[in-house]
Amino acid sequence: MEEEILWAEKYRPKSLDEIVNQKEIVERLKKFVKEKNMPHLLFAGPPGTGKTTAALALVRDLYGNNYRQYFLELNASDERGIDVIRNKVKEFARTVASNNVPFKVILLDEADNMTADAQQALRRTMELYTETTRFILACNYLSKIIEPIQSRTALFRFYPLKKEDVVNRLIQIAKNEKVEFDPKGIETIFDITQGDMRKAINVIQAASAYGKITVETVYKVLGLAQPKEIREMLHLALSGKFLQARDKLRELLINYGLSGEDIIKQVHKELTGNEISIPDDLKVILVDYAGEVEFRIMEGADDEIQLSAFLAKLALHAEKYSGGK
């Protein structure tokens, strides 16, 4: 059914012409389509910036509607072993390419999760089948790709998408799906997802279940407290009102079902932002301590005890606090 389709897939660009961002990359890829020739490619950049989309659009433009016959997509996170290289990749690389385009394409998504041995095997396979196959490797961290592969590929760096591009795309999707929205809700999605288009579209789809996309519904679907509530808790602690701050903490833990890790990450963001006025020397102390608390929580320490201790530390520094917005 239509409503069950993931919007991130439904609105994924089908051709290079439909990709509105990463313009320099798109222009370079279009030249490959025009010439019907290309080197092995390495797409590097954060999640949700269009690496897989660009690869799929490229092969669609190269082969047309029958692109699946000449294209193999593997996720290296699911299949990290050397057998993937020796079996699936080699089997596909041996088969005949299209008459129109003299090579087939293999996309290895999340290639930075491949083992070093698998990458070495891939390097040898790339050399062996260069005449009939082109490889596109997509990774989040370029440093995790071995140098012999980097030297055999053309590098394309993908950057987080601009706010204007993401917001406009989300508004277009909301209108197309006939979902009411508050512009601040759309902007909040960008502020949280930070240029990750796939995550942003997933959030807007989840928030649409509430009937209207607002700041409140966005934070609800993400399981996060609104920044103003985190600031209220910090303000109480920094004003010396430890017990009230602890009550607010318990409210966040119980009412929102937040984990201690979720809360301390939001606390860190508020401490390093501009909404709370804290002297720089105090800010350094608190951010450092927030890091310690997050480490202990991740190691299995009790969420409430660790966060209460953090609030107590804030309360002890109350005389240095000059208030906040």
UniProtKB/Swiss-Prot annotation:
SMART domains: AAA. The keyword Lyase does not apply. One of its GO terms (molecular function) is ATP hydrolysis activity. One of its GO terms (biological process) is DNA-templated DNA replication. The keyword Nucleotide-binding applies. Keywords: ATP-binding, DNA replication, Nucleotide-binding. InterPro entries: AAA+_ATPase, ATPase_AAA_core, DNA_pol3_clamp-load_cplx_C, DNA_Rep/Repair_Clamp_Loader, P-loop_NTPase, Rep_factor-C_ssu_arc, Rep_factorC_C, RFC_lid. Pfam families: AAA, Rep_fac_C. CDD domains: AAA (cd00009), HLD_clamp_RFC (cd18140). This is Replication factor C small subunit. It comes from Sulfolobus acidocaldarius (strain ATCC 33909 / DSM 639 / JCM 8929 / NBRC 15157 / NCIMB 11770). The lineage of its organism: Archaea, Thermoproteota, Thermoprotei, Sulfolobales, Sulfolobaceae.
